[in-house]
């Protein structure tokens, strides 16, 4: 896919990132992953991120990665575009990016590199190397150890024509506003904070209405309803869902580090689309927490 075509796709609508299915031994389980994608595809997400953050990219091996991307691309062909997660050390990110391109993904989401903090010059070199290793579109994820400044993004935009998107996982409105004012329509902008619905209205007011939804994995109808409420400035629906579901959901999610992923897999299990356990160092929700989440989900009605 042409980078500009990808930019157009991710400039509107709701995005999501399916969890990655594992069996009880923690190995990739293609059968239920296919079933998951087939279930989610018709609900109307503009694109799906395979092996993204919620898809536990950080826990995958180089041998598993191609099978996961190939499964997603083949399952969703003609239904919804697949954007592959890549990240980690520069050379590993490049290897994943090139493999995703070979397998037919429509672009990549570049997650942060591994562990070490780096200055802007090093971050620019890392992102530039990945962008120049492929021809299709790249979205950079500003989060954790990769926090690019407006000036750094301007340099990258000039050097890398296929860098078409910026996903924010920091939540600093001043920084986000500075980036948006400086770069304008050079990028597509995606809200990428955990449980992005909580911040969606604020980001829309800034001029960046697109975000990725984790809860789409288990309450896809509600996720789409909330997105449409934000798009139409339906504050009554937004506030009702924030008050009755998202705030209690946040309280449960925040009980343990890493639950931002674990709670999504738990939700999928509760609604009958079991994705298996998370991989260490993440931990699954405790039984009482599962019951608490089940009550919240049931209150939303059929999906």
From Swiss-Prot:
Q: Can you state which reaction this protein catalyses?
A: 5-dehydro-4-deoxy-D-glucarate + H(+) = 2,5-dioxopentanoate + CO2 + H2O
Pathway connected to this protein = Carbohydrate acid metabolism; D-glucarate degradation; 2,5-dioxopentanoate from D-glucarate: step 2/2
Q: Which GO terms describe its biological process?
A: D-glucarate catabolic process
Gene Ontology molecular function: 4-hydroxy-tetrahydrodipicolinate synthase activity; 5-dehydro-4-deoxyglucarate dehydratase activity
Keyword annotations: Lyase
Matching Pfam families, A to Z? DHDPS
Looking at its record, which EC class is this enzyme? lyase
Signal sequence segment? none
Database matches in InterPro entries: Aldolase_TIM (IPR013785), DapA-like (IPR002220), Dehydro-deoxyglucarate_dehyd (IPR017655)
SMART domains attached to this UniProt entry? DHDPS (SM01130)
Under the heading NCBIfam families, the entry gives: KdgD (TIGR03249), PRK03620.1 (NF002958)
Family statement drawn from the similarity comment of this UniProt entry: Belongs to the DapA family.
The record, for HAMAP family, names: KDGDH (MF_00694)
Task: Give the protein's recorded name.
Answer: Probable 5-dehydro-4-deoxyglucarate dehydratase
